[in-house]
Amino acid sequence: MNIRSNPDTTLPAVTTGPLPSSRKIFATPDEAPELRVPLREIILSDGAGEPNLPVYDTTGPYTDPSVTIDVNAGLSRIRTAWVKERGGVEEYQGRDVKPEDNGNVGAAHAAKSFTAYHKPLRGLDAPAAGTANSPPPRGEGSGVGGATNTVPSSTPLPTPPPQGGREQGIAYACGPHLPPMVTQLEFARAGIITKEMIYVATRENLGRKQQLARAEAALADGESFGASVPAFVTPEFVRSEIARGRAIIPANINHGELEPMIIGRNFLTKINANIGNSAVTSSVEEEVDKMVWAIRWGADTVMDLSTGRNIHTTREWILRNAPIPIGTVPIYQALEKCEGDPVKLTWELYRDTLVEQCEQGVDYFTIHAGVRLAYIHLTANRTTGIVSRGGSIMAKWCLAHHQESFLYTHFDEICDLMRKYDVSFSLGDGLRPGSIADANDRAQFAELETLGELTKIAWDKGCQVMIEGPGHVPLHKIKINMDKQLKECGEAPFYTLGPLTTDIAPGYDHITSGIGAAMIGWFGCAMLCYVTPKEHLGLPDRNDVKVGVITYKIAAHASDLAKGHPAAQLRDDALSRARFDFRWQDQFNLGLDPDTAQAFHDETLPKDAHKVAHFCSMCGPKFCSMKITQDVRDYAAGLGDNEKAALNLAGGSSLGSVGMSISGKLEDGLPADAFAKAGMAEMSEKFRTMGEQLYLDAEKVKESNKALS
């Protein structure tokens, strides 16, 4: 249910309540029994003859009837306690909200501020050099490419004392002589399994216990192109994947409302939904509603791409009500702060925007640090030039100042800042192709190579990283994108927009991109950014968001099936059995969109009796292939031995239980052909006596067979 704690709020009630025939359940991991990991259980009909099906759940508390949703107060901040338990962080006052944070909007157009305020957390600095608790000196290096790791990633760091421990008044979380750990990558490299790692391992297993025989069979049936999908996900496997940089848990320490999830090629393929206002349309109310709506249908993360007024306020409302990771493109807001003129952008303005969003709790930033001055001319002969908003902003800045991008030259500082809050990098593809004519050109791949260099720097700084990819790519050029990304970026998770496989279908680009998304997900892409029917045409509304999410859930699931993910096919098989058994309600409920499935069925067969009918409106009652198959099975089960023998002979197959002698005669002495003719004549007569009807009730057939036996 929804309530409003403040009667003056303009926020509408968001969509709550379970999906059809579903309920929220919670798995309790053995490693941390205090954790409650959410799953959605699809309740099957009484006649199903099989257990209910648990599936991955992204909906947060919004589908839990036991939780009262109050968007004005926000969700419970359960994860904040986990962060504080680990130590190595401090609570502080944070920066004040400035007028430019909301685009200097006037009072008449200002959105209502979020009512609750939470002091932000940040990672503690290392003890000063020369003190008893000072860390070893960092490796020398300057600018991009010069950073080194304090401790090699292969060297285990000391285990932290309980509750983060303290020595001589200095907080630490990785031993008294090293700087405090903050990020999931740092903990993973230290051999420490966090609660977030335990949580996501349980989610990935979809509530199943170890079923190794079936899991290994599924893996053997798939083609993973070199991925290392496990038969069963353990917290240790999660830790090892994060330590290697092959997976990330985007989880800002200030996003206490978050239900952790993992992004990596060896886990379930995830999808992202984009929302956000613009200078000409949408509002805070609509964007919060779209976020809740997107996760209801399966979005694993949401990016707030707001570019209009009230950006800070919109983001605060979204974050405080978001159980999933929230990403942003900070350059959008920075541009609003300088009146939309890219030439006026400065490093100081951008850095202040990063701090603002880190304190709010944004989980990952798209940063277009790979758009270098030397690459811009490579786009001159493109059909569609630079289509990334962030890429075009930085390209214009570079040309106007004829300098290297400040995102590139200050990358070390960006890493240091993001590490303090465990904000993950989503290294942006500012030079991605905007048409299939530009796919895989030198500009695109030059930027990708630079992103690989930046990935290593971010890793050395302790930051989690994923890489953004295209874009518009025809089918035959998709795999090279995946292969090159894995090679250049050290297997960091890949996150792509589609790709769109053709440019001829405005209004249907959720389909043109869904095709490419399924393929690149199969090849190893870890997260797919959805495309809606409004792509290239306008800002998506609520219905467009749903269509985009469902389309990409299909693509992600198809890629998981192809990779041989151990649990992926459980839902397919359950729905197939329901379809064959004519359990219509189970068919609807096992689908990704039960409401639409039932609505389509009911357009032509609206009566309740049709929900149990053994046919649909496509074939009708007399031509349903599955009904015919069921009749054949029932018929065969009731045949006597003589009838089976006759049918076998007529079809040229073996006689089964009725033996045949070497002389070519049946055991009762009759010639085989005579026996067959007699049996066929008997069945012909039976057909006439039963009314010469092609389709018969199965029970009547069984009764008739008893008389013949």
From Swiss-Prot:
GO cellular component term, pick one: cytosol
The entry's substrate-binding residues are 274, 303, 332, 368, 388-390, 429-432, 468, 495
GO BP, one annotated term:
thiamine diphosphate biosynthetic process
Q: What is its EC number?
A: 4.1.99.17
**Catalytic reaction annotation:** 5-amino-1-(5-phospho-beta-D-ribosyl)imidazole + S-adenosyl-L-methionine = 4-amino-2-methyl-5-(phosphooxymethyl)pyrimidine + CO + 5'-deoxyadenosine + formate + L-methionine + 3 H(+)
Q: Which residues bind [4Fe-4S] cluster?
A: 616, 619, 624
**Amino-acid positions noted as binding Zn(2+) in the UniProt annotation, renumbered to this chain:** 472, 536
Per its Swiss-Prot or TrEMBL entry, what cofactor is needed? Answer: [4Fe-4S] cluster
Ranges of Polar residues composition bias in the record: 1-13
Q: In which pathway does it act?
A: Cofactor biosynthesis; thiamine diphosphate biosynthesis
Kindly indicate whether the keyword Heme belongs to this entry: no
GO molecular-function annotation terms?
4 iron, 4 sulfur cluster binding; carbon-carbon lyase activity; zinc ion binding
Q: Per UniProt, which keywords does this protein have?
A: 4Fe-4S, Iron, Iron-sulfur, Lyase, Metal-binding, S-adenosyl-L-methionine, Thiamine biosynthesis, Zinc
Pfam families per record: ThiC-associated (PF13667), ThiC_Rad_SAM (PF01964)
Span list, region Disordered: 1-21, 125-168
Q: What class of enzyme is it?
A: lyase
Give me the comment on cofactor binding: Binds 1 [4Fe-4S] cluster per subunit. The cluster is coordinated with 3 cysteines and an exchangeable S-adenosyl-L-methionine.
Under the heading InterPro entries, the entry gives: ThiC, ThiC-associated_dom, ThiC/Bza_core_dom, ThiC/BzaA/B
Listed HAMAP family:
ThiC
Spell out the family assignment given in the record's similarity comment.
Belongs to the ThiC family.
- What this chain does, per the record? Catalyzes the synthesis of the hydroxymethylpyrimidine phosphate (HMP-P) moiety of thiamine from aminoimidazole ribotide (AIR) in a radical S-adenosyl-L-methionine (SAM)-dependent reaction.
Fill in the subunit field for this protein: Homodimer.
Q: What is this protein called?
A: Phosphomethylpyrimidine synthase
